[in-house]
């Protein structure tokens, strides 16, 4: 079941930003987010893939690959409502839970329906779908993404019950960047990562070039991270293995052999891979944001002058600093 959603017209974006004094510049992005609705961010036409929970898991993951999307809302025909999201994280959890060896077919992936997987995986921990109204502010959207530790937030029309769009950190930051030059620049934009202490610098989850994919999947599950820097024997970053790379196992139908190294698994994208996107502690927040938006990536690896991994800065970290804490270290 696939749906293509088109809105009638391009949303009008307000140009009237509140007048800010130099002392209050640190809250300009917060004010911007509070004065714009989720609807303002929805494009004129966008494709949305929706899965019925009675669909086989395997077919659903192949459909994600075919449509070039990372997640899809789940529709329960019995309840006549959206009940959750199917994401690459589900694919990782299924592979990690049921993989035995390259010689044994993963029955659960081949035969389970989405609803069966959800019953097994969620058991008694069923949570209502986290979603947002198109009339809610972007500030509320950012708050919900960060508070619930999710990467995708469906925008659902409360009247029709239809899913209109899926908000992500990436799309929100890109929208903010379109108007960023219209604001007085907050003081914190010129400060360094080290000064602002934005990002994660302790217990960074990493893998070696020789780490088997199955072990990497276990790290994703245990640490709940979206990417793993791949390092050499000296701790220098040479690649990055992200959750998105895992879906390629479905694309190439190679998910029955998870004993191969992450380096081998990443060869599929070697012809267009431009290298790991990095940053340094002395670089300013403004520089970091520009790099993230221009490269359209979800995180940067913080390194020292020898390319040794020091931390990770994610879009979630950036939005939290810009919108929720006004450049201050997160509470």
Curated annotation (Swiss-Prot):
GO terms for cellular component: cytoplasm; cytosol; membrane; nucleoplasm; nucleotide-activated protein kinase complex; nucleus. AMP/ATP-binding subunit of AMP-activated protein kinase (AMPK), an energy sensor protein kinase that plays a key role in regulating cellular energy metabolism. In response to reduction of intracellular ATP levels, AMPK activates energy-producing pathways and inhibits energy-consuming processes: inhibits protein, carbohydrate and lipid biosynthesis, as well as cell growth and proliferation. AMPK acts via direct phosphorylation of metabolic enzymes, and by longer-term effects via phosphorylation of transcription regulators. A motif (AMPK pseudosubstrate) lies at residues 138-159. Disulfide bonds: none annotated. PROSITE patterns: CBS (PS51371). ADP 2 binds at residues 70, 170, 242-245, 269, 277, 298-299. ADP 1 binds at residues 85-90, 130, 151-152. Residues 1-12 have a biased composition (Polar residues). AMP 2 binds at residues 70, 170, 242-245, 269, 277, 298-299. One of its GO terms (molecular function) is cAMP-dependent protein kinase regulator activity. It comes from Homo sapiens (Human). Belongs to the 5'-AMP-activated protein kinase gamma subunit family. Residues 1-26 are annotated as: Disordered. This is 5'-AMP-activated protein kinase subunit gamma-1.
């Amino acid at each position: 079941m696939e749906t293509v959603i088109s809105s009638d017209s391009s949303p009008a974006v307000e140009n009237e930003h509140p007048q800010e004094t130099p002392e209050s510049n640190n809250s300009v992005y917060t004010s911007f987010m509070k004065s714009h609705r989720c609807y303002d961010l929805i494009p004129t036409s966008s494709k949305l893939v929706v899965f019925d929970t009675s669909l086989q898991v395997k077919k659903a993951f192949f459909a994600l690959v075919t449509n070039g999307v990372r997640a899809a809302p789940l529709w329960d025909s019995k309840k006549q409502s959206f009940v959750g999201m199917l994401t690459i994280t589900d694919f990782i959890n299924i592979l990690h839970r049921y993989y035995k060896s390259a010689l044994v077919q993963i029955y659960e992936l081949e035969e389970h329906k989405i609803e069966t997987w959800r019953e097994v995986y969620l058991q008694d921990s069923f949570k209502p779908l986290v979603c947002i109204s198109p009339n809610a502010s972007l500030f509320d959207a950012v708050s919900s993404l960060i508070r619930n530790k999710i990467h995708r937030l469906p925008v659902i029309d409360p009247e029709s019950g239809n899913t209109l769009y899926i908000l992500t950190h990436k799309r929100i930051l890109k929208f903010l960047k379109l108007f960023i030059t219209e604001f007085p620049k907050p003081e914190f934009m010129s400060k360094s990562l080290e000064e602002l202490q934005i990002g994660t610098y302790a217990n960074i989850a990493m893998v070696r070039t020789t780490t088997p994919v199955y072990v990497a999947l276990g790290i994703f599950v245990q640490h709940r991270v979206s990417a793993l820097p791949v390092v050499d024997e000296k701790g220098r970053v040479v690649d990055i293995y992200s959750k998105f790379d895992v879906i390629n196992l479905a694309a190439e139908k190679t998910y029955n052999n998870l004993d191969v190294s992450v380096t081998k698994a990443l060869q599929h994208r070697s012809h267009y891979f431009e290298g790991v996107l990095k940053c340094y502690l002395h670089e300013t927040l403004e520089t970091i944001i520009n790099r993230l938006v221009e490269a359209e990536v979800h995180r940067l690896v913080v390194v020292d002058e020898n390319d040794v991994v020091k931390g990770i800065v994610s879009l979630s970290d950036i939005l939290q600093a810009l919108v929720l804490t006004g450049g201050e270290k997160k509470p």
